[in-house]
Amino acid sequence: MFFDRVEIEFQAGKGGDGCMSFRKEKYVPKGGPDGGDGGRGASIVLEARLGVNSLAQFATRKFFRAEKGGFGMGALRHGRKGREMRLFVPCGTSIIDAKDGFVIKDLTQVGEEFVICRGGKGGHGNARFKTPQNQAPRERELGQPGETRHVIMELKSIADVGLIGKPNAGKSTLLSRISSARPEIADYPFTTKYPNLGIVDVDIERSFILADIPGLIEGASEGIGLGHEFLRHVERAGLLVHLIEPTPVDGSDPIQNYVAIREELQHYDESLADRDELVVMTKCELDPDGEVREQLQAYFDEHPANHARDLRSISAATDVGLKELVGEIMTRVAKRREEMIEAGITPTLIRQDDAPVTPKKERRLPPHKAAATGGLSDEVQAQDIQGAATLSDTGKVVPGERRDRSS
């Protein structure tokens, strides 16, 4: 199941308590204090990871507590640090304070991480309190508690382009035709129940991310239908592709449908209504005479706006206009990326090649399984291991002849 909003409480690990101990050793009178410090509690880190597409792992667990630090011990032995708790979230996750509602952090880049709660500091042992005036201190410190945070995590998909429109307008079909995404497609409204993302490869060097959200209906901004729950997924999109069906199955007017969606965007977020928009009439094979297209174009000519520069017609069934549409989208996306770079903003690119390379740890065999010369070079083996024991033909161990290093 798809989860894009969860409420979680995090608690970092408590620091370990300091130890009160005195050195007790034979022939060492008045050994003095030797209590070690407690270890620092574990912190909780959130990391944006490629391949994580939902907040489902947080849906059934509402409280995360990190490991405590170890207690200090005698002989000046410090407690061990708590093991860091690292949790992976999708790129585009916003961390919001549940009490005040302000955004604490936006994780938008692959590999970006944020320490949501820091572990408590370990307490000092009594050895720390030794002074010339107090040679045998009998005091220590308790470990400090770890930070606690109650947050809401919201997933806002990292998409360059957002597909919007009425239910059954052909959004999922278009996504499946121009990308490798395979959303559920059927001939009834509200087939799409959660957002789908697809990467559209224009050529070897150019690509963009397309987000398909459930269809919007009148009253969506007030909680009617499904689309209002997922409008946040197009908030980051710099371009909206508004799909219009020429002959809606419910017999509604395409122009009125377009106006209704625009009003819902305005009610949800005024910045979305002012976003760059490309209007596309889908299923053009159902309008062979071009009558609906002429009506739509006439409406846009009478109501000029920045968001409706022109009208395009496509057919996902016959591939009419798809190549031209993808080219136009790529041009607008590239222009926006250039504007972001000029403004000092790094565009978010989610590709497999962008993922941070994690060095592989060398696998070491336990001593009882490792060969006698497995960790040595051939040169060392030849010079220093000539005296190694060998097996005779009878299966008995025959000691080798040890070489004199001085010779």
Curated annotation (Swiss-Prot):
GO cellular component, one term: cytoplasm
Residue span, Obg domain: 1-158
PROSITE patterns reported for this sequence: G_OBG (PS51710), GTP1_OBG (PS00905), OBG (PS51883)
Main localization category: cytoplasm
Residues binding Mg(2+), per UniProt: S172, T192
Stretch list, region Disordered: 353-407
Family of this protein: Belongs to the TRAFAC class OBG-HflX-like GTPase superfamily. OBG GTPase family.
Subunit comment: Monomer.
Name this protein carries in UniProt: GTPase Obg
